[in-house]
Design a protein with these regions (language model features):
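Residues that mark the start of a beta-strand
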Residues: 6, 33-37, 246-248, 274, ...
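Structural motif
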Residues: 8, 87-89, 118-120, 150, ...
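C-terminal and late-domain segments of enzyme folds
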Residues: 110, 243-245, 258-269, 274-275, ...
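Internal gly/pro-rich beta-alpha loop/helix module
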Residues: 127-241
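Phosphate-binding active sites in nucleotide-utilizing proteins
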Residues: 247-308, 314-319
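Cysteine-nucleophile active-site neighborhood
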Residues: 300-376
Length: 438
């Protein structure tokens, strides 16, 4: 067993304030000298950026559906290195997964790791009902231990005391860890894919500090530390995730291309690849000597004019002789053109015969299992991978591309073949996470 104890901060539903509480708790404990390692359940790219600000170290995703069990075990071991406590923020509601049984949920991760759950409840409009609500969650799955409850957006000391009493009546053995008051100054700005990324959030350090002040004043931090438990996951080798795209991988990294998993970049380095970074928005070229380019997802639709006019970047990618791979936003930039929210078309790299549009917004969301249709640097034809899709843009036109993947959704329903490949260039809307397990 890993000696480093951990906790999962979860909630009954999205929008309960768990990200803000997670940031405040991480920073409040760090102030006390606790070396906090942050994790995020599920595939989200944005929350880990906030966690990094709060803790000063990279946050790792632990995905109960898209990662193999040995991958999660390896990442949990990595989290425990040089840390006193692992705090994992859950995803959506505690039991929300890919189906009615909650497969792939934060509860799945809690049962697998043995980490106790702190349930953060939006208590605005609740009093005596707080007790039955928490009791219902606590009784839902004997493999998931809800060790304590936090009330968020409380209305004052009398309200907090009512909530404490309500929990004691229904769950006498569960700890009430405190009530955090309503504070609009703790709100984090949002956009179409969720929270505005950490690097673009003004005054983020002030918000984290204010959240830490609120947690320090309202929560029993000593009790929270006592509730943490080591993981049940056994020792595991470092996570491999996806094979390297090349010997030297140049990764686009800026506000338009921000969605690359730190664990994947670290895994590439462990497997012997060099990883360098460049900014298309700054009109930079991939590093000299790179034999592969990775254009990750992000927000190219918000910077499309600047990308189109980045002449050095565009010329370098069009002339690049190595392997070029794009995911989601990176896939859009590899195409012939991108139509922005105002309906204006911008010429893109023209490396794949695809036109995309952000003017006709439609949500595409869900886990995907895909089978590779051709040999590529990260896999042989027929290999399967797991990942996820989350975007509002859409394919406007295609010119008979060679397809990259045969996909199905998390329930196993077959979907239309997707992505495109041409020569040394390939991409799709799907963010790959791990090889498919046995």
């Amino acid at each position: 067993l890993s000696a480093t104890p951990g906790l999962i901060l979860a909630a009954p539903s999205s929008g309960s304030g768990k990200t803000t509480i997670a940031l405040g708790l991480m920073r409040a404990l760090a102030r006390r000298g606790v070396r906090v390692a942050a994790a995020k359940a599920g595939p989200d790219y944005i929350d880990p950026g906030f966690h990094r600000v709060a803790t000063g170290r990279a946050c790792l995703n632990l995905d109960p559906w898209a990662m193999q069990a040995q991958t999660r075990a390896g990442l949990a071991s990595e989290l425990g290195c040089d840390a006193d406590l692992i705090v994992c923020e859950g995803v959506m509601g505690l039991f929300d997964g890919i189906d009615a049984a909650g497969t792939g949920s934060s509860a799945t991760l809690a049962a697998e790791t043995g980490w106790p759950v702190l349930l953060a409840v939006d208590a605005k409009g609740l009093a005596a009902s707080f007790g039955p609500l928490v009791a219902g969650f606590a009784a839902a799955d004997p493999a998931v231990r809800i060790a304590g409850a936090i009330a968020n957006r409380t209305g004052g000391t009398r309200h907090v005391e009512l909530l404490r009493q309500a929990l004691a009546r229904r769950c006498p053995d569960m700890q009430f860890l405190g009530g955090i008051g309503r504070d609009q100054a703790l709100a984090l700005p949002e956009r179409h894919l969720g929270l505005v990324p950490a690097g673009e959030t003004p005054d983020l350090e002030r918000v984290v500090e204010r959240a830490a002040d609120a947690c320090t004043a309202a929560l029993d931090l000593d009790a929270i530390l006592r509730l943490a438990r080591p993981t049940r996951l056994g020792a595991a080798p470092p996570a491999r995730l996806l094979a390297p795209l090349g010997q030297h991988i140049a990764v686009a990294s800026d506000a338009a291309f921000a969605f690359a998993y730190p664990a994947q970049l670290a895994a590439w380095r462990r497997q012997g690849a060099e990883v360098s970074f460049f900014s298309p928005l700054a009109d930079q070229k991939p590093a000299v000597g790179a034999d592969a380019v990775f254009l990750p997802g992000g927000y190219p639709e918000l910077h499309v004019g600047k990308i189109a006019s980045a002449s050095c970047f565009v010329a370098a990618l069009r002339a690049f002789a190595g392997f070029v791979y794009g995911e989601c936003g990176g896939y859009m930039v590899l195409g012939d053109g991108l139509v922005d929210a105002d309906g204006t078309r911008h010429a893109m790299l023209g490396l794949l015969p695809v036109e995309t549009t952000f003017a006709k917004r439609k949500l595409h969301l869900g886990y995907r299992k895909v089978r590779l249709r051709a040999d590529l640097p990260f896999g042989r034809a027929g290999m399967s991978f797991r990942g996820h899709e989350f975007h509002y843009s859409a394919i406007l036109a295609e010119n008979r591309p060679e397809r990259l993947f045969d996909p199905c959704d998390a329930a196993g329903h077959t979907l239309e073949s997707c992505g495109a490949r041409r020569g040394n260039v390939a991409g799709s809307y799907i963010h790959l996470i791990d090889q498919d397990g046995p």
